[in-house]
A protein has these predicted regions:
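Helix-rich interaction surfaces within compact, conserved domain-sized segments
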Residues: 62-116
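A generic structural signal for short, non-catalytic loop/turn and secondary-structure boundary residues
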Residues: 22, 34, 47, 68-70, ...
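Amphipathic, interaction-prone secondary-structure segments
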Residues: 26-56
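Intrinsically disordered, low-complexity boundary segments flanking structured domains
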Residues: 15-18, 42, 60-64
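Negatively charged, low-complexity tracts enriched in Asp/Glu with abundant Ser/Thr
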Residues: 1-33
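Eukaryotic intrinsically disordered, low-complexity regulatory linkers and tails enriched in Ser/Thr/Pro
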Residues: 4, 19, 37-40, 115-116
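Generic structural hydrophobic/aromatic packing signal, biased to beta-strands
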Residues: 10, 29-31, 41, 54, ...
Length: 116
């Protein structure tokens, strides 16, 4: 589906962006126009066939969620200082990429099983 395709590509971009960050920064999304500000990405998902969602929090800690149709998808990644109360930065791209690889691997493993 278009949503799944976009979801997988965004994960690749998130991971690549995070590979360039030092240990004091983590990835966030910036928004153009208005006072929407910056979303510290804590997760993302999709709803077939055509909706992507990002969720997390803003600088004050208030929860935020962006729900976006794939035809209007624009994502601006930004580096933010990691949260002071965390010893390590949140690497959402690495976590989502690992989850994606595990889910693809489990689907392949299920397909390879022979019926008894």
């Amino acid at each position: 589906s278009p949503a799944e395709w976009a979801y997988e590509r965004i994960i690749v971009y998130l991971k690549n962006f995070e590979e360039q960050l030092d240990n004091e920064h983590e990835v966030a999304m910036g928004f153009a126009g208005g006072d929407a500000g910056v979303l510290r990405i804590e997760g993302m998902g999709y709803f077939d066939p055509d909706v992507i969602t990002f969720y997390g929090s803003e600088a004050s800690g208030a929860k935020m969620q962006l729900i976006q149709h794939v035809s209007q998808l624009n994502v601006m990644l930004r580096a933010l200082p990691k949260q002071l109360d965390q010893p390590e930065p949140n690497r959402i791209g690495f976590r989502l990429a690992a989850d994606l690889e595990n889910s693809v691997g489990s689907v392949k493993a299920k397909k390879k099983k022979k019926p008894r």
